[in-house]
Swiss-Prot record:
Domain ClpX-type ZB: 1-50
Source organism: Chlamydia pneumoniae (Chlamydophila pneumoniae)
Protein family per UniProt: Belongs to the ClpX chaperone family.
Single GO MF annotation: unfolded protein binding
Organism taxonomic ancestry: Bacteria, Pseudomonadati, Chlamydiota, Chlamydiia, Chlamydiales
UniProt-listed PANTHER family: ATP-DEPENDENT CLP PROTEASE ATP-BINDING SUBUNIT CLPX-LIKE, MITOCHONDRIAL (PTHR48102:SF7), ATP-DEPENDENT CLP PROTEASE ATP-BINDING SUBUNIT CLPX-LIKE, MITOCHONDRIAL-RELATED (PTHR48102)
Annotated InterPro entries: AAA+_ATPase, ATP-dep_Clp_protease_ClpX, ATPase_AAA_core, Clp_ATPase_C, Clp_protease_ATP-bd_su_ClpX, ClpX_bact, P-loop_NTPase, Znf_CppX_C4
NCBIfam families listed in its UniProt record: clpX, PRK05342.1
The UniProt record lists the keyword Chaperone: yes
The entry's keywords: ATP-binding, Chaperone, Metal-binding, Nucleotide-binding, Zinc
Name this polypeptide is given: ATP-dependent Clp protease ATP-binding subunit ClpX
Annotated SUPFAM superfamilies: Glucocorticoid receptor-like (DNA-binding domain) (SSF57716), P-loop containing nucleoside triphosphate hydrolases (SSF52540)
Binding residues annotated for Zn(2+), in chain numbering: 9, 12, 31, 34
Length: 421
C-alpha cells in the first residue's frame, strides 16, 4: 500500500485503522497514542530518561552504568554456569573492558581501544548461551538471542539483520538508551560460513552476504529499525539505534574446526594422522584452545567479520562430573527445581548419587550436553507428577541408579494411615 491508500503515524507507524485519531501536520501525522505518550514524558522530571526516543544518531548516555570487576563478573557466572573456567575468565575480562570503554566515553574521555565482541566455540550444550544469558542478568542490561540460520541479506526470503536490533529494543521496552548498551547473542554463527553445505536455494548460498550484513551492526552503525519488524519499505518510519556500544556475542559448534587447526599446526606436532576420523574430545578441546583467526577464515568466515571479534574462546565438552554438578549445584539447578515441586505436594524427592551419574551418562550419550538433562528428568518424573497430587499416601520418592539405567520403578515410601489421618 502507498500513502494514498493508507495514512500512518509518522512516529510509531500505526495506520489510521489502528488508532482513534490521526492528526495531520505539514507532511507528518501523529496518532492519539503517541500524543498521550509524549504527554506522559513531558510530565516527568527533567532528569528522567526518555524511554521511547525515536532517533539516536550517537550512542545514548545513561548515567547509571556500574562496571563490575572481572572477578565479580566471574563470581556471579559461577552461580549458574558449571565448568568452563578459562572461558568464564576470558569473557569476564572482555565484558569488563567493553563496559569500561562505554563508561569512559560517557565521561568524554579519549578511548583508543575498540569493542570487545566475543566469539564462543564449543559443542552443543556446553554452556555458550547460558553464559550470555547470565551476563545480561548480572549486568542488568537488555538481552536477546538470534539464530544466524534464519538471517538473510537484503533481497532474500528470511529475516533482516536489523530485526535482531529490534528484538533487543523490545527487550528494553523500546528504551533506546538501554538497548544501546545491551547484549545480543547470535547462535549457530558457524552455519553461515561460506563453505557450509545444505542451505536453501532461497537464501544466500555462500553465507558471505549474511556475514557482510551482520558486519555493519557488529562493528557499530546507526541501524534503521522497523518498529513492527518485517521487511523495510520506502514509506515506513524507523527507530534509529546506534549499535556502537552493544556487546555482540556469537556462538557455534564449528564442527571439524579442530581438524583445520591440526592441519595448521602440523600432524606430527599433535600425534595423529588424517585417516583418524574420530579424535578424542580431550584432543579436540586442546586444538580448539589454539584457534587463530586464520582457522576461522579457512572454515568459511570472512576476514572482516572475524576481525570484529577480538575475544575468541572455546567452551569445552562437559565431563560427567560437570554434568552431575549442573544437576545439583547452580542456584537454579534443575534437580533443586523438581525437589521444590514435589515438596509443594508434601513429598520428599531423593536422588541417589549413582542415579545422578546415570542421568549424566545418558545425557552424554545423547551428545547434546547439558540440554539433555532437562528432557531426561522430565521423562523420568512426568508420570509421578501426574499421580502424586491425587495420592496423599506418598511420603518420599527415591530415585536409584537402576531407575535410570534399567527403567525400573523408583522406590516409593508411603505414610502410615495414622500419619494421613
Amino acid at each position: 500500500m502507498n500513502k494514498k491508500n493508507l495514512t500512518i503515524c509518522s512516529f510509531c507507524g500505526r495506520s489510521e485503522k489502528d488508532v482513534e485519531k490521526l492528526i495531520a501536520g505539514p507532511s507528518v501525522y501523529i496518532c492519539d497514542y503517541c500524543i498521550k505518550l509524549c504527554s506522559g514524558i513531558l510530565d516527568k522530571k527533567p532528569s528522567s530518561t526518555i524511554s521511547s526516543a525515536p532517533v539516536s544518531e550517537t550512542p545514548s548516555q545513561p548515567s547509571d552504568l556500574r562496571v563490575l570487576t572481572p572477578k565479580e563478573i566471574k563470581k556471579h557466572i559461577d552461580e549458574y554456569v558449571i565448568g568452563q573456567e578459562r572461558a568464564k575468565k576470558t569473557i569476564a575480562v572482555a565484558v569488563y573492558n567493553h563496559y569500561k570503554r562505554i563508561r569512559a566515553l560517557l565521561h568524554n574521555k579519549q578511548v583508543s581501544y575498540g569493542k570487545s565482541n566475543v566469539l564462543l566455540l564449543g559443542p552443543t550444550g556446553s554452556g555458550k548461551t547460558l553464559i550470555a544469558k547470565t551476563l545480561a542478568k548480572i549486568l542488568d542490561v537488555p538481552f536477546t538471542i538470534a539464530d544466524a540460520t534464519t538471517l538473510t541479506e537484503a533481497g532474500y526470503v528470511g529475516e533482516d539483520v536489523e530485526n535482531i536490533v529490534l528484538r533487543l529494543l523490545q527487550a528494553a521496552d523500546y528504551d533506546v538508551a538501554r538497548a544501546e548498551r545491551g547484549i545480543i547473542y547470535i547462535d549457530e554463527i558457524d552455519k553461515i560460513g561460506r563453505t557450509t553445505a545444505n542451505v536453501s536455494i532461497t537464501r544466500d548460498v555462500s553465507g558471505e552476504g549474511v556475514q557482510q550484513a551482520l558486519l555493519k551492526i557488529v562493528e557499530g552503525t546507526t541501524a534503521n529499525v522497523p518498529p513492527k519488524g518485517g521487511r523495510k519499505h520506502p514509506n515506513q518510519e524507523y527507530i534509529r539505534v546506534n549499535t556502537e556500544n552493544i556487546l555482540f556475542i556469537v556462538g557455534g559448534a564449528f564442527v571439524n574446526l579442530d581438524k583445520i587447526i591440526a592441519k595448521r599446526l602440523g600432524k606430527t606436532t599433535i600425534g595423529f594422522s588424517d585417516d583418524q576420523a574420530d579424535l578424542s574430545q580431550k584432543t579436540r578441546d586442546h586444538l580448539l584452545a589454539k584457534v587463530e583467526t586464520e582457522d576461522l577464515i579457512a572454515f568459511g568466515m570472512i576476514p572482516e567479520f572475524v576481525g570484529r571479534f577480538n575475544c575468541i574462546v572455546n567452551c569445552e565438552e562437559l565431563s560427567l562430573d560437570e554434568l552431575v554438578a549442573i544437576l545439583t549445584e547452580p542456584t537454579n539447578a534443575i534437580v533443586k527445581q523438581y525437589m521444590e515441586l514435589f515438596a509443594e505436594e508434601n513429598v520428599k524427592l531423593v536422588f541417589k548419587k549413582e542415579a545422578l551419574y546415570a542421568i549424566a551418562k545418558k545425557a552424554k550419550q545423547a551428545k547434546t550436553g547439558a540440554r539433555a538433562l532437562g528432557m531426561i528428568l522430565e521423562n523420568l518424573l512426568r508420570d509421578l507428577m501426574f499421580e502424586i497430587p491425587s495420592d496423599p499416601t506418598v511420603e518420599a520418592i527415591h530415585i536409584q541408579e537402576d531407575t535410570i539405567a534399567e527403567n525400573k520403578a523408583p522406590i516409593i515410601i508411603r505414610r502410615t494411615p495414622e500419619a494421613i489421618a
